Amino acid sequence: MVYKLVLLFCIASLGYSVEYKNTICPHRQDYRYWYFVAELTIGVNYDINSTIIGECHMSESYIDRNANIVLTGYGLKVNMTIMDTDQRFVAAAEGVGKDNKLSVLLFTTQRLDKVHHNISVTITCMEMNCGTTKYNSDLPESIHKSSSCDITINGSCVTCVNLETDPTKINPHYLHPKNKYLYHNSEYSMRGSYGVTFIDELNQCLLDIKELSYDICYRE
């Protein structure tokens, strides 16, 4: 009888010990597995003609369950935060497309879909047409997605912004480091798209990432 009571106690203790708890990925400088979480396209009203090696710099942090990345390059500062999340940013790359469009590839430790997230993006003009806040509102979504996104644009250099989350395509010519492994969403219905434009139709802000060359943003 005593043996049975001890066994029941052990089973109950084991069941209690595996109760779900929130955890996060430990901080590393050399994550090997990159998930392609978002592609951000930004149009500007000054000339950017080609991808420049070493132009983009990045810093990332994870504080109070908020994942943040800050990118600088091509006259812009891009600050993105994913709120209340277990994931963190691991890398980014930037490339220049036609008609003065900048494409930003963002990589994290896991995907966005099936979990509601609040995403905040701030884009600041650093060199040309700097000035007061031009736009501060929710970023309209053109494809239904569970995440919500707000954007702030400081300065008048930005002509359009398009954000695609959990993209289903990744540039096959993107030259990522050989010791990294890239993953991306394969379910078309789970991707999201948000955009705003100031001078052109929004579809003019879309780029075929297969036509671009990218350079990885250097960590600061």
UniProtKB/Swiss-Prot annotation:
Entry function: Plays a role in immune evasion. When secreted, inhibits T-cell activation by preventing the binding of host CD80 and CD86 to soluble CTLA4 and CD28. In the infected cell, may inhibits host NF kappa B activation.
Protein name: Early protein OPG038
A biological process from GO: symbiont-mediated suppression of host NF-kappaB cascade
GN (gene name): OPG038
Species: Monkeypox virus
Subunit structure, interactors included: Homooligomer. Interacts with host CD80 and CD86 when secreted.
Phylogenetic classification of the source organism: Viruses, Varidnaviria, Bamfordvirae, Nucleocytoviricota, Pokkesviricetes
Keyword Cytoplasm: no
Sorted UniProt keywords: Early protein, Glycoprotein, Host endoplasmic reticulum, Host-virus interaction, Inhibition of host NF-kappa-B by virus, Secreted, Signal, Viral immunoevasion
Post-translational modification: Glycosylated by host.
Induction note: Expressed in the early phase of the viral replicative cycle.
